[in-house]
């Protein structure tokens, strides 16, 4: 078997435990405890568990949104747990995130055009003409009409907004998508459409997925393998 492109070793994340002025020490919350996972190129690894077991905390730790309390995370053999700002921006070209609630993750003041242009401009530094070409392609591959580029997020349904969220994640042409409950905020009929789109994109673009959900039935469709998080620890399903 080939080497994993993303390796998680003994990663833990704890909150609290700090002494507060003139108050008892805050209790320690073990959000993620000693997690080991391997993600291979072209893989779709599902991570399932009940709400509160640390799935979303793990995803945010991988992305560097919050640091791990212990452990290491490797991308293509490089430890990415202590990257500085510039190094983290380079990593975000290759690893992108799709959020649970598309409406809260899209800036309501910006048009879709501005939302999609932002990562291309900030992370890739490409010119306006190339950004426009890429935006049209992104809208096409998520099955959205090009005229929607000049609309704002509140003008879309939940399913349409999540398609925009997926397009934004694909704007840097990443290798890995971390999908944190990407369909849980959607109606069941729309969930099926988004899952079908994600499977199609994985095959067409050669993507690798870490797919997080509380619903094993949702993961059964897009996942090659599933790990179960229980008491903040994953075990093979």
Question: Which functions belong to the PLM regions below?
Answer:
Residues 186, 190-237:
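P-loop NTP-binding/switch modules centered on Walker-like glycine-rich loops
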Residues 152-156, 160:
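Conserved ABC ATPase signature
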Residues 173:
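Conserved catalytic motifs of ABC-family nucleotide-binding domains
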Residues 79, 129-147:
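Conserved ABC ATPase "signature" region
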Residues 21-26, 80-96, 114, 122, ...:
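ABC ATPase NBD coupling module
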Residues 71-79:
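Conserved ABC transporter NBD signature motif
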Residues 63:
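Helix-to-loop junction immediately C-terminal to a conserved catalytic motif
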């Amino acid at each position: 078997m080939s080497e994993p492109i993303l390796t998680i070793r003994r990663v833990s994340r704890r909150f609290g435990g700090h002494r507060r002025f003139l108050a008892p020490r805050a209790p320690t919350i073990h959000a993620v405890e000693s997690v080991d996972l391997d993600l291979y190129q072209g893989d779709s690894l599902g991570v399932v568990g009940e709400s509160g077991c640390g799935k979303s905390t793990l995803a945010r730790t991988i992305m560097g949104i919050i640091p791990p309390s212990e452990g290491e995370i490797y991308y293509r053999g490089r430890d990415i747990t202590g990257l500085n700002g510039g190094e983290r921006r380079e990593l975000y070209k290759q690893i992108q995130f799709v959020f649970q609630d598309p409406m809260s993750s899209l800036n309501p003041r910006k048009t879709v055009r501005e939302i999609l242009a932002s990562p291309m401009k900030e992370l890739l530094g490409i010119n306006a003409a190339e950004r426009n070409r890429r935006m049209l392609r992104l809208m096409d591959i998520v099955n959205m009409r090009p005229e929607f580029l000049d609309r704002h997020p509140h003008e879309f349904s939940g399913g349409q907004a999540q398609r925009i969220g997926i397009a934004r994640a694909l704007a840097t042409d990443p290798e890995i998508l971390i999908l944190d409950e990407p369909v849980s905020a959607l109606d069941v009929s729309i969930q099926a459409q988004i899952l079908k789109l994600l499977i199609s994109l994985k095959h067409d673009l050669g993507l690798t997925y870490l797919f997080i959900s509380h619903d094993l039935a949702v993961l059964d469709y897009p996942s090659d393998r599933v790990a179960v998080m229980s008491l903040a620890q994953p075990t093979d399903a």
